[in-house]
């Protein structure tokens, strides 16, 4: 079983391995530090504070990259929509009987009232 100190040393070694893509020579001074790309994916305390870019991105969670917008879900195009597949003559024929039924009902009601009085 390892002692707690050895476990900490092992975690520091793994942290150093993660940050090996960035060398201390490549990091500019804090005064002239511009936010250059940092490919370190470790989120340990040491790696979060090792440069301004990592502090903003990992420590504070601020990311200035352009976010990709989701593409709208593709709707299935129906080649024959239900409302447009009937012709004009079919629509006109379907409407006329409804009007005739209303007129016949009205005439029957009028006839019934006239005979009863």
Swiss-Prot record:
It is found in: Host nucleus, Host nucleolus. Residues 81-91 have a biased composition (Polar residues). Residues 1-27, 68-117 are annotated as: Disordered. GO terms for cellular component: host cell nucleolus. A motif (Nuclear localization signal, and RNA-binding (TAR)) lies at residues 66-70. It comes from the Viruses. Its main location: host cell. Residues 55-65 are annotated as: Core. GO terms for biological process: positive regulation of viral transcription. Transcriptional activator that increases RNA Pol II processivity, thereby increasing the level of full-length viral transcripts. Recognizes a hairpin structure at the 5'-LTR of the nascent viral mRNAs referred to as the transactivation responsive RNA element (TAR) and recruits the cyclin T1-CDK9 complex (P-TEFb complex) that will in turn hyperphosphorylate the RNA polymerase II to allow efficient elongation. The CDK9 component of P-TEFb and other Tat-activated kinases hyperphosphorylate the C-terminus of RNA Pol II that becomes stabilized and much more processive. Extracellular circulating Tat can be endocytosed by surrounding uninfected cells via the binding to several surface receptors. Endosomal low pH allows Tat to cross the endosome membrane to enter the cytosol and eventually further translocate into the nucleus, thereby inducing severe cell dysfunctions ranging from cell activation to cell death. Through. Belongs to the lentiviruses Tat family. This is Protein Tat.
């Amino acid at each position: 079983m390892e002692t707690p100190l050895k476990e900490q040393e092992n975690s520091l070694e793994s942290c150093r391995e993660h940050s090996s893509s960035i060398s201390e020579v490549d990091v500019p001074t804090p005064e002239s530090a511009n936010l250059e790309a940092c490919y370190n994916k470790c989120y340990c305390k040491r790696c979060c504070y090792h440069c301004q870019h990592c502090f903003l991105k990992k420590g504070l969670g601020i990311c200035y990259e352009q976010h990709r917008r989701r593409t709208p879900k593709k709707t299935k195009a129906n080649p024959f929509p239900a409302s447009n597949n009937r012709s004009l003559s079919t629509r006109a024929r379907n409407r006329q009987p409804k009007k005739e039924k209303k007129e016949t009902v009205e005439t029957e009601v009028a006839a019934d009232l006239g005979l009863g009085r």
